Amino acid sequence: MNRSLSKRAIGLGLSLGAMLTCQFAAAADGIGGAGSSAAAPVYRTWAQEYRKAGGEALEYDPVGSGAGLARIKQRQTDFGAVDVMVPRNELARDGLVMFPTAVSGIVPVVNLRKGGAPLKLSGEVLARIFLGEISHWQAPEIVALNPGVALPNEAIRVVCRSDGSGSTHHFSDYLSKVSPAWKARFGVVGR
């Protein structure tokens, strides 16, 4: 696909998304969107390319899937981006249409402050870390998965989101599938 055609396709996709998602323009000037922080880089790139191609300004606020969904339901924005499917009856009730625009992945990130081999964690070990059952990098379960890797004698500091997030939903869904203890205690959360 050549660059000009690509720009037109991006513009058309954004325009259709805005028109189908909301029956009126919430933004006074240009197109406004809000939602998934994971998808923000894609929307920023599309907005820049669409503007270069002569389209309207597009502003995207990466407030998280939950807040984006709330804003589109309250007609505070032209489109909302979420990482989790919204039930059909909810879409119908609120006069919304949903279609996929991007795909993203979730990867735990660690900072051991030492170079070396990549760290390996199983789903069960990851769940136990987030449950607080494994609290140090030199825990036998982590050492067993990483033979020969020099692990620090330090506590694991877990950082996570607290808002309604599609990433939280998908991550907790995964942990629920690999850990009966996680499923029983928390289950799938976020959206």
What are the language-model segments listed below?
Residues A26-R191:
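Flexible loop/hinge segments at secondary-structure junctions
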Residues M1-K7:
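N-terminal secretory signal peptides that target proteins for export/translocation
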